[in-house]
Amino acid sequence: MNEEQAVLNFFAQKENLPLALSVANQVDGTRQKLNNDFWLALSERIVASTPDWRVSTTEDRNATESLVGLYLQPEAEQKLYLRPMLEQQYLGDTLRIYYGLMWSAEPTLEQKQLSVIYTLHNTFQEAGFKSNESFLAWQWTSYYPRSMDFILRFSTTADALLNEATSLIQNLLVSHRDALHAANTALRESSRSAAISVVSLDKLRVNLER
């Protein structure tokens, strides 16, 4: 019997349950810290390699001290845009990281049908990405951030893992740089036009009431 199995057998004994639960809590805390460390380190890598974007981390809605991902914002301020992102999501009883392009707000049907948006959507579909109401494109990665393999790899060869994860965003930005820029520009202009139309309609109503 090896040492690891001997330890597991020790904790499996009923009289050792209090100690086993205490160790489990300690391990959960370590997993959470390493998970946060991963997202913070990845965010720093992406900030250094993508000067044209602002990078923000994403917190768990139910636990603000827990980081679950990151996303990129264009330098130009706008409410509606497509943002590159990576995030961890529960898949059954484990967590898995996915990435892609997420809508920053709900687009109108007309905005979804803009030619640059339609073309970009088709490009990602042909590359094997999925889409839904929240995402123009998304795809699972091979990363399970709470798994033993992932945690040990991050603890021993963090640079290699972070470089791999960073390359997912970098490849997306490089491969679709012009199309993504055109899409976000079109969304900004369409939102501005819609706002102008609303203001003009309000002025018309005021004039009619006089």
List each language-model region with its residue ranges.
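Polyanion-binding interface signature
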Residues: 10-150
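Ampiphathic alpha-helical segments that act as solvent-exposed interaction surfaces
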Residues: 107-210
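N-terminal domain-onset segments
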Residues: 1-45, 174-180, 184-194, 198-209
